[in-house]
């Protein structure tokens, strides 16, 4: 997300808040102005080197926005009514006795400075004059009636410590606690921010939500209660629409504008890896909180409730600790941190001390600094990961949000937890789930001393957006003012956790080795990276001793450096990315390109899971993939067949028109992937827990796959569409589970394309030179779609396709036909057909004995499976060869006879010709390809319903895994083909019916003596009838 620091200006040069006063007072005020002016210049100088050129243009075309503290606004109002001297005294007293909110350092924007139409760098929606949002941050401070106050002192110099290190990249969005685990900041319970209302500020309605807020660490001396939080920088809050007729008052918190947090950073000092709270409530008030941790990365949120009886809340953090930020230099660390288990989530009974010794602070600071660049897989001469502006955000659960789109949207954690809390009304699970939220929420879940704004909240978290299970927290206790307490949140059901490790198991487009990172324009291995760098820096000139067409792979990449270097250039490696001065580090201009590619990979994964879950739900309970069999998992220990994804190229910006083959092409032959468009599809999102009971309505349960889950509140309820869980209503608890989008669509760029790009892959033709290739029948619907189109095939399907040798099949076929008719005047064509089928059966047996799943079975089980599937596979083989290899209907033999090749697929029954053509047309309409063919062949072979199988469990596991791989493959590579998986599965019974008729015909011929005996074909016919 594009963010940049706007210098905090003290007050505008043409404004004077003090009128006639004593000369001493005027002199002090003049010094104060000069001091702030000097700080402003320093901040601008420090800011300049971090600006991207687009930001510089935006900053140059937009006026700098002055910010005023509320104490100055109070002095301005007081001056007009009670005089300058009394006003200065009142402000000084307010400075030493600030209210319990400790927002003395909060800067707001006055509406008169904005003219109702200024936007920062064009990234936020234009600001409009609206009622201020009096919500405070539930994680930062607790707002109550100002009957008691705490002494705070604002140190403006701290702005320099917390505001000048923003490099506007993904590195600044992580912190590294003492336990070493990286935490994505977007997963922290997200706060809601707004201006603070002051009774003495009569022009409150003229203020708007700030575009930039900054909260400095405080050092109060309160002992009754404390909230320990890291200093937080907030950037770019987008104001939401609100009813203009709604009145704004401190008693009606939830009726004003609420801001959407688009980007923020957290700096952690000392040993603060989490937030701890201790809350003191007034008499008659109740407070309850619970925490739940997801099976993946979800953590429980904290609910706090403060009564109307003088709460004391302080914010404490030592200013001596110099906060540092950890860095992520690769997508591997980003995904690893999102998958890694987090530190234990604090609950309401956990209290952390704010006092640490200077030695501990120094140790923590040294630990965080030393860990800044650990774990990065980029070598020192790689391109530095310059994360410039492009309008993308990645949340903790891999969600993707394009903030440049005209459609407001969100992806990430679903609803969950309880009803609204005191400050922003968001549900606990929704906060803990991660992701971005649009928050106009309403009243709280239960009353407290008659105050509807101080409700109890159940914080049963529902894990992450992928549906991890969460444990429900206890509901709130009812106060004297209202007998209804919050109900307990129920645990969420476990879903499949997203595994991002497969994103990095890609193959080098040059040699096929495993990639190590982005090098000189695209993902390559370490060997090709070093070879390319040495060639360019040393200006080497190679020659090829062959025909300049040497095959380059992992085993022989060093044989011909000429052809290897040419292939590096062909796949898209950039000469200009290599530094001629031999200095370490790459060219920063490629940084945005790398970040854009990483963000799209996570977006692809999210969309893949959503679509796959939707299809599985529509298919019902029939499709239930089981874990991979031990034998297959041992052969591929790092494989996740359900979530495999391959993106071999960065984007069209990093490659030439004739660009790199995909990883499947490296394994199976060259592929022209320049025209096919694909998008990945989702996995199971799980089911979220139920929210706590609302003030006037019971709890609601949101299902991870519900299309429109809503609560039972008596006000307008917010619903989750698409594949999201139900949202919480104004007066009711929120439902849980799923990934939520406000319109059910995941959009790309600024257009309205749905989550499944209407850019399918053409049929994969099996030619003499390649196993898989695209046709250009379909095209991507947008430029953004074209950037993420390379073929993504799971390793299982790649392994299946490698086991098929169509060239050998056709060679053996025509060789047998010519051999049988050599020096023969005339032959029996039916007998010749039986010999060809017998040869095909031998080929089937040889193929099956060397395939995964099948080779682990005992011989008896193998024979039973082959005896019940051979005819179906023969029909499918012939359909495949007609569609993909252009097998003709007939061929002329050496003796001049015409042999009907189609009879091989009909098993000698000419009456089935029309039926056979109908099946072929159905498969072609479904864009039947090699991946579909091998999966369907395995589904026919691994039939767990065959009687007499001893190791039925292995067969069933293999069948389910293949079925899941086919489902994932069809959704991944053919999103534009409706119900392709269902169509392919439905064709299998039709093939079987046709094969049964062919078997009966062959058996009849055999009994009549017209067919040859003592052949494998006849043995199969008899064995099936005996069984």
Swiss-Prot record:
Record note on what altering residue 584 to Q does: 10-fold less binding
Gene Ontology terms describing biological process: dendrite morphogenesis; hormone-mediated signaling pathway; imaginal disc-derived leg morphogenesis; instar larval or pupal development; juvenile hormone mediated signaling pathway; lipid homeostasis; metamorphosis; mushroom body development
Record's keyword annotation contains Lipid metabolism: no
Tissue expression notes: Expression in the parasegmental primordia of the embryonic blastoderm.
Phenotype for residue 563 to S: 100-fold less binding
Effect the entry attributes to changing residue 587 to Q: 10-fold less reduced binding
Biased composition (Acidic residues): 380-396
Biased composition range(s): Low complexity: 36-48, 300-324, 335-349, 443-461, 697-721
Disruption phenotype: Ftz-like pair-rule cuticular defects.
UniProt GO molecular function: DNA binding; DNA-binding transcription activator activity, RNA polymerase II-specific; nuclear receptor activity; RNA polymerase II cis-regulatory region sequence-specific DNA binding; RNA polymerase II-specific DNA-binding transcription factor binding; transcription cis-regulatory region binding; zinc ion binding
GO cellular component, one term: nucleus
UniProt xrefs under PANTHER family: NUCLEAR HORMONE RECEPTOR FTZ-F1, NUCLEAR RECEPTOR SUBFAMILY 5 GROUP A
Protein name listed in UniProt: Nuclear hormone receptor FTZ-F1
């Amino acid at each position: 997300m594009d963010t940049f620091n706007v210098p905090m200006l003290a007050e505008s040069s043409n404004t004077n808040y003090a009128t006639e006063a004593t000369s001493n007072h005027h002199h002090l005020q003049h010094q104060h102005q000069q001091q702030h002016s000097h700080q402003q210049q320093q901040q601008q100088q420090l800011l300049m080197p971090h600006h991207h050129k687009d930001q510089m243009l935006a900053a140059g075309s937009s006026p700098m926005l002055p910010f005023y503290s509320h104490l100055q606004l109070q002095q301005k109002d007081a001056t007009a009514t009670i005089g300058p001297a009394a006003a200065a005294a009142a402000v000084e007293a307010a400075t030493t006795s600030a209210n319990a909110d400790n927002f003395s350092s909060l800067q707001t924007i006055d509406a008169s400075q904005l003219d109702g139409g200024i936007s920062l760098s064009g990234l936020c929606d234009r600001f409009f004059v609206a009622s201020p949002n009096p919500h405070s941050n539930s994680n930062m401070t607790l707002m109550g009636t100002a009957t008691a106050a705490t002494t705070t002192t604002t140190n403006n110099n701290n702005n320099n410590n917390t505001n000048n290190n923003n490099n506007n990249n993904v590195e600044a969005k992580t912190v590294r606690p003492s336990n070493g685990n990286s935490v994505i900041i977007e997963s922290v319970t997200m706060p809601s921010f707004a201006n603070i209302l002051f009774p003495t500020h009569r022009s409150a309605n003229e203020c708007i939500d700030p575009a930039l807020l900054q909260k400095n660490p405080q050092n109060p001396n309160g002992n009754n209660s404390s909230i320990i939080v890291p200093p937080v920088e907030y950037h770019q809050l987008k104001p939401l629409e609100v009813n203009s007729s709604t009145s704004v008052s401190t008693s009606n918190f939830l009726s004003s504008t609420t801001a959407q947090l688009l980007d923020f950073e957290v700096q952690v000092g000392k040993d603060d890896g989490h937030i701890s709270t201790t809350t003191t409530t007034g008499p008659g008030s109740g407070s309850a909180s619970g925490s739940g941790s997801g099976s993946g990365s979800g953590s429980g949120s904290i609910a706090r409730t403060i009564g109307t009886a003088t709460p004391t809340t302080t914010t404490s953090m030592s200013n001596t600790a110099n906060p540092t930020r950890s860095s992520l230099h690769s997508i591997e660390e980003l995904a690893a941190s999102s998958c890694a288990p987090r530190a234990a989530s604090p609950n309401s009974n956990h209290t952390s001390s704010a006092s640490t010794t200077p030695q501990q602070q120094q140790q923590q600071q040294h630990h965080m600094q030393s860990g800044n660049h650990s774990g990065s897989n980029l070598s020192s001469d790689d391109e530095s990961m310059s994360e410039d502006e492009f309008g993308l955000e990645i949340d903790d659960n891999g969600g993707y949000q394009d903030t440049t789109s005209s459609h407001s949207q969100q992806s990430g954690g679903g609803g969950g937890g309880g009803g609204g809390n005191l400050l922003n009304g968001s549900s606990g699970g929704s906060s803990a789930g991660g992701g971005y939220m649009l928050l106009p929420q309403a009243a709280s879940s239960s009353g407290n001393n008659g105050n509807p704004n101080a409700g109890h909240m159940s914080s049963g978290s529902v894990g992450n957006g992928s549906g991890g299970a969460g444990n429900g927290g206890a509901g709130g206790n009812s106060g004297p003012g209202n007998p209804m307490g919050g109900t307990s949140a129920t645990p969420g059901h476990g879903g499949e956790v997203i595994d991002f490790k497969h994103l990095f198991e890609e193959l080098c487009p040059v040699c096929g080795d495993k990639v190590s990172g982005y090098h000189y324009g695209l993902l390559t291995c370490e060997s090709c990276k070093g070879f390319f760098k040495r060639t360019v820096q040393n200006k080497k000139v190679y020659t090829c001793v062959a025909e300049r067409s040497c095959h380059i792979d992992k085993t022989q990449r060093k044989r011909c450096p000429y052809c290897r270097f040419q292939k590096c250039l062909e796949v898209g490696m950039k000469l200009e990315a290599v530094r001629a001065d031999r200095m370490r580090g790459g060219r920063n201009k490629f940084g945005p390109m790398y970040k854009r590619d990483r963000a799209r990979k996570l977006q692809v994964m999210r969309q893949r899971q959503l679509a796959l879950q939707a299809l599985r739900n529509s298919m019902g309970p029939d499709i239930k993939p089981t874990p991979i069999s031990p034998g297959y998992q041992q052969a591929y220990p790092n494989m996740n067949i359900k979530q495999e994804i391959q993106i071999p190229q960065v984007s069209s910006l990093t490659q030439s028109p004739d660009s790199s083959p995909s990883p499947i092409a490296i394994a199976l032959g060259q592929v022209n992937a320049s025209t096919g468009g694909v998008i990945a599809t989702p996995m199971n999102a799980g089911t979220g827990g139920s929210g706590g009971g609302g003030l006037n309505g019971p709890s609601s349960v949101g299902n991870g796959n519900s299309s429109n889950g809503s609560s039972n509140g008596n006000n307008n309820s917010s619903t989750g569409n698409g594949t999201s869980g139900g949202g919480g209503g104004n007066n009711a608890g929120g439902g849980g589970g799923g990934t939520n989008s406000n319109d059910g669509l995941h959009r790309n760029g600024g257009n309205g394309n749905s989550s499944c790009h209407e850019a399918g892959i053409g049929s994969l033709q099996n030619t003499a030179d390649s196993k898989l290739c695209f046709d250009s029948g379909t095209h991507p619907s947008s430029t953004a779609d074209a950037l993420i189109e390379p073929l993504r095939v799971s390793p299982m399907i790649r392994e299946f396709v490698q086991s098929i040798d169509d060239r050998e099949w056709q060679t053996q076929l025509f060789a047998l036909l010519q051999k049988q008719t050599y020096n023969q005047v005339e032959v029996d064509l039916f007998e010749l057909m039986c010999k060809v089928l017998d040869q095909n059966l031998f080929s089937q047996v040889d193929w099956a004995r060397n395939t995964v799943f099948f080779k682990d079975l005992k011989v008896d089980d193998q024979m039973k499976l082959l005896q019940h599937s051979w005819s179906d596979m023969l029909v499918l083989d012939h359909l495949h060869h007609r569609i993909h290899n252009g097998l003709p209907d007939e061929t002329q033999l050496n003796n001049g006879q015409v042999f009907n090749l189609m009879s091989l697929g009909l098993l000698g029954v000419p009456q089935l010709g029309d039926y056979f053509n109908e099946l072929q047309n159905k498969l072609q309409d479904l864009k039947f390809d090699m991946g579909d063919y091998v999966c369907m062949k395995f589904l026919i072979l691994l039939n767990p319903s065959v009687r007499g199988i001893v190791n039925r469990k292995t067969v069933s596991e293999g069948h389910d895994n293949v079925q899941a791989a086919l489902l994932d493959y069809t959704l991944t590579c053919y999103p534009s083909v409706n119900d392709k998986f269902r169509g392919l599965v439905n064709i299998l019974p039709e093939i079987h019916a046709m094969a049964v008729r062919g078997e009966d015909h062959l058996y009849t011929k055999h009994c009549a003596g017209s067919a040859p005996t003592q052949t494998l074909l006849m043995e199969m016919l008899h064995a099936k009838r005996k069984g």
